[in-house]
């Protein structure tokens, strides 16, 4: 979590199996919102960590209760450029904002998938459930594709670039399907 008074990492590059569930207390905002700095630092660090991994799928979810108002190192232009570059590498992004026009904010950063939520326990819970359903949908699609690929029904194996684009498209389709439920 990032705020103008501190940066607190809940998890930093640990296996999913070792991560514990987060609760509402883990997301208590304070101070102001250096959203661009939070994104820039996290995305840059994650990119360094995964850049040499083969067949990596990177799914980024940005959750915020506020708009950018305190960044020092990154600005809207640099974040938009970073997101566009990473999307070109197959990364997928979801922006979830409380009590704001999340679609407009996300679009300003070249993020396709956006979701609004009410800043309340129920609003947060519902948004997290929807995001979880989206991820499960995505991983179901990925499992089917991987199974078909292993059985050789897909013909020639996809190149790394094709694979990353396929993963990003699967993520977008999963998001759209869950939004339309």
Where in the sequence are the language-model features?
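Acidic, low-complexity intrinsically disordered regions
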Residues: 1-181
């Amino acid at each position: 979590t990032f705020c103008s008074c501190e940066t607190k990492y809940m998890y930093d590059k640990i296996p999913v199996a070792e991560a514990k569930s987060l609760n509402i207390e883990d997301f208590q905002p304070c101070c102001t919102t250096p959203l661009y700095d939070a994104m820039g630092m996290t995305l840059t660090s994650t990119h360094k960590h995964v850049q040499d991994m083969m067949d990596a799928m990177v799914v980024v979810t940005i959750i915020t209760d506020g708009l950018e108002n305190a960044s020092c190192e990154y600005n809207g232009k640099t974040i938009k450029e970073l997101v566009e570059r990473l999307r070109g590498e197959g990364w997928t992004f979801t922006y979830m904002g409380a009590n704001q026009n999340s679609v407009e904010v996300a679009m300003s950063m070249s993020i396709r998938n956006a979701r609004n939520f009410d800043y309340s326990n129920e609003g947060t819970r519902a948004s997290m459930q929807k995001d979880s359903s989206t991820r499960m949908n995505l991983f179901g699609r990925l499992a089917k594709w991987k199974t078909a690929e292993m059985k050789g029904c897909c013909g020639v194996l996809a190149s790394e670039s094709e694979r990353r684009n396929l993963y990003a498209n699967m993520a977008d389709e999963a998001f759209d399907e869950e939004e339309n439920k």
